[in-house]
From Swiss-Prot:
Key words of the record: Cytoplasm, Cytoskeleton, Microtubule, Nucleus
InterPro entries: Lipogen_MT_Stabilize_sf, Spot_14
Tissue and organ distribution: Expressed for a short period in the cells that will produce the enveloping layer (EVL).
Function text: Involved in stabilization of microtubules. May play a role in the regulation of lipogenesis.
Listed transmembrane segments: none
One of the GO BP terms on file: regulation of lipid biosynthetic process
Region (Disordered) location: 87-109
Native organism taxonomy: Eukaryota, Metazoa, Chordata, Craniata, Vertebrata
Composition skew (Basic and acidic residues), residue ranges: 87-105
Any one Pfam family match given in the protein's UniProt record, by short name: Spot_14
Keyword Nucleus applies: yes
Similarity comment: family membership: Belongs to the SPOT14 family.
Name of the featured protein: Mid1-interacting protein 1A
Compartments, record wording: Nucleus; Cytoplasm; Cytoplasm, Cytoskeleton
Length: 152
């Protein structure tokens, strides 16, 4: 059961993160045997096109199966819930601080605001796509094990 969200909250980053986390948690609870996802193509139509168009394409995209998406989505969920490793953040700060040109405070404030807006829009879009992928993976898993109408 989904609750209707006010229009102002529908596009909020927090709401998008909660939708993503909910979709991944649902996926995690539904997928009881993740190893069944190995070698299952992400999209059946794409798989048919690969087999007919380019005989070597399956080798290049061998890792693009549902299990790799499952692992990736769970990893992203863990990063959102628990944060990324602190040492990676410190390393990035050192790399960016060494290469930044000197700016005035007013320019920095304006740049930071624009930069924040840019990243928030991008993050919202990425979270929406990841939520869709988690829901699709859950539905495909249900189809694969024969419970496609269960739990809706």
């Amino acid at each position: 059961m989904q609750m209707s969200e006010p229009l102002s909250q529908k596009n909020a980053l927090y709401t998008a993160m909660n939708r993503f986390l909910g979709a991944v948690n649902n996926m995690d609870q539904t997928v009881m045997v993740p190893s069944l996802l190995r070698d299952v193509p992400l999209d059946q139509e794409k798989e048919q096109q690969k087999l007919t168009n380019d005989p070597g394409s399956y080798l290049r995209e061998a890792e693009a199966d549902m299990y790799s998406y499952y692992s990736q989505l769970k990893s992203i969920r863990n990063n959102i819930e628990w944060g990324v490793i602190r040492s990676e953040d410190q390393r990035r700060k050192k790399d960016t601080s060494a290469s930044e040109p000197v700016r005035t405070e007013e320019e920095s404030d304006m740049d930071l605001e624009q930069l924040l807006q840019f990243h928030l829009k991008g993050l919202h879009g990425v979270l929406s796509q990841l939520t869709s992928q988690a829901n699709n993976l859950t539905n495909r898993y249900k189809q694969e094990i024969g419970i496609s109408g269960w739990g809706q």
